[in-house]
Swiss-Prot record:
Reaction(s) this enzyme catalyzes, per UniProt: (2R,3S)-3-isopropylmalate = (2S)-2-isopropylmalate
Top enzyme category: lyase
GO-annotated biological processes: L-leucine biosynthetic process
Keywords recorded for this protein, A-Z: 4Fe-4S, Amino-acid biosynthesis, Branched-chain amino acid biosynthesis, Iron, Iron-sulfur, Leucine biosynthesis, Lyase, Metal-binding
Function according to Swiss-Prot or TrEMBL: Catalyzes the isomerization between 2-isopropylmalate and 3-isopropylmalate, via the formation of 2-isopropylmaleate.
Domain of life: Bacteria
Assembly and oligomerization: Heterodimer of LeuC and LeuD.
UniProt binding sites for [4Fe-4S] cluster: 353, 413, 416
CDD domains the UniProt entry points to: IPMI
Cofactor: how and how many bound: Binds 1 [4Fe-4S] cluster per subunit.
Name of this chain's protein: 3-isopropylmalate dehydratase large subunit
EC number(s) given by UniProt: 4.2.1.33
Pathway(s) this gene product operates in, as recorded in its UniProt entry: Amino-acid biosynthesis; L-leucine biosynthesis; L-leucine from 3-methyl-2-oxobutanoate: step 2/4
């Protein structure tokens, strides 16, 4: 038998109708995750066409994008002030009730960011196909699943048929080797990959991350890597399942139990790429040479080492890249050749589906413990789910954040996309652990530096872009 990649195995196992020269493939979807922003039109289409949800048992909804993260009132209820957000949340509740879809609503102990709750509930499993009306669905690929975002019309199609029309993408091995230096995290790995190879490197491909560095990462670190595959242009990102994967899934609410668990693990062990399998393209990264990373522009590919300098137009041979740099620096009010270390900041956001899990909060709290954030800096700490929040509070992490002067908020997408009052004011600078730094992403006129939780905390302490390595061990 011809050796196959991880992607090949998962794709081939889900073909309902093979791809031909004239038509794309039809593939079966194992898990469909939905939220309040990209699903309303899909449900409207179902009603108009008299259709039902084919597999409500393979569908799960949560509220995350529009949910306020404001602390609960005296009555224990999270207040929803924004009228549009309230309407979206009500609509999702009505849609799920009508079509029989389980929902983790605002106020549920399991509510949270869709790409946080899937893994923590044990819904995300190796070998699955997983879709959601959200581009960062690639997060679930950390488990050896084929997971990607879909559009609203495709959401309707999956709800009605549990299938999806797709053209088979190519494969790209992203090999990462070398031991990480202190202060360098999974977030720095993915920012470095995107900075080196560009936001279009993965166009038409699925990334498979391999190498000793990837194998040494925890599951939550692997999720950070796969989360930003889309920022590298890829359709999805995958990491082969191993014992680290199985240990993470074991015992979670929706994980297989008993004999079914043994059978599942036996199958999952067959998924890693076969020796001799051929990728369409291979790129590499020496992780031992990495330092903490930070972005300086208006796409995630505009990144550099924390102690570096913004490139000059002369360093960019491509005219389009020079034009993009000029436009980005005008928006960011920065100069070519300028260092970012010491650049004043106004906001720090610790959260998003990239970096809001318990390990991220632990990492940040360790660095912040016994310290204060700088005067004039607003720091928002937003756990990725109610379960993460509960665990963090059980460990006393929230008290560390509050004692330092940070806001401890409820679970949700929050400032990643500038929802409700979780915004960066116009013209102000934020160090953010999220995944996108587009113009206006965190609020009209907001200027975003993407970085790791460690860099975010160090910057909050200094009130300026800071290198976290100076705080390690102290």
């Amino acid at each position: 038998m011809t050796p196959r990649t991880l992607f090949d195995k998962v794709w081939d196992a889900h073909i309902v109708r093979p791809q031909t020269a004239e038509t794309p493939a039809v593939i079966y979807i194992d898990l469909h995750l939905i939220h309040e922003v990209t699903s309303p039109q899909a449900f409207t289409e179902l009603r108009q066409r008299g259709l039902k949800v084919r597999r409500p048992d393979r569908t799960l909804a949560t509220m995350d994008h529009s949910t306020p993260t404001t602390p609960r009132g005296a009555d224990g209820i999270i207040p929803v002030v924004d009228a549009q957000a309230a309407a979206q949340l009500r609509q999702l509740e009505q849609n799920c009730a009508e079509f029989g879809i389980p929902l983790f609503a605002l106020g549920s102990e399991y509510q949270g960011i869709v790409h946080v709750i899937g893994p923590e509930q044990g819904l995300t499993q190796p070998g699955m196909t997983i879709v959601c009306g959200d581009s960062h669905t690639s997060t679930h690929g950390a488990f050896g699943a084929l997971a990607f975002g879909i559009g609203t019309s495709e959401v309707a199609h999956v709800l009605a048929t549990q299938c999806l029309i797709q053209t088979r993408p190519k494969t790209m091995e992203v090999r990462v080797d070398g031991r990480l230096a202190p202060g360098v995290t999974a977030k720095d790995i993915i920012l470095a990959i995107i900075a080196r190879y560009g936001v279009g490197a993965g166009t038409g491909h699925v990334f498979e991350y391999t190498g000793e560095t990837i194998r040494a990462l925890s599951m939550e670190e692997r999720m950070t890597i796969c989360n930003m595959s889309i920022e590298g242009g890829a359709r999805a990102g995958m990491i082969a399942p191993d014992d680290t994967t199985f240990e993470y899934i074991a015992g979670r609410p929706f994980a297989p139990k008993g004999k079914a668990w043994d059978e599942a693990v036996a199958y999952w062990r067959t998924l890693p790429t076969d020796e001799g399998a051929v990728y369409d393209r291979i790129i590499t990264l020496d992780a031992s040479q990495l330092t903490p990373m930070i972005t300086y522009g208006t796409n995630p590919g505009m990144g550099m080492p924390i102690d570096g300098r913004i490139p000059t137009p002369e360093e960019l041979p491509d005219p389009a890249a020079r034009q993009a740099l000029d436009k980005a620096l005008r928006y960011m009010d920065l100069r070519p050749g300028q260092p970012l270390l010491g650049h004043k900041i106004d906001v720090v956001f610790l959260g998003s589906c990239t970096n809001s899990r318990i390990s991220d909060l632990r990492m940040a709290a360790r660095l912040l413990k016994g310290r204060k954030i700088a005067d004039g800096v607003r720091m928002m700490v937003v756990p990725g789910s109610q379960q993460v929040k509960k665990q963090a509070e059980a460990e006393g992490l929230h008290e560390i954040f509050r004692a330092a002067g940070a806001e401890w908020r409820e679970a949700g997408c929050s400032a990643c996309l500038g929802m409700n009052d979780d915004k960066v004011p116009p013209g102000r600078y934020a160090v953010s652990t999220s995944n996108r730094n587009f113009e206006g992403r965190q609020g009209p006129g907001a200027r975003t530096f993407l970085a790791s939780p460690l860099t975010a905390v160090a910057s909050a302490i200094e009130g300026a872009v800071a290198d976290p390595r100076r705080y390690l061990g102290g």
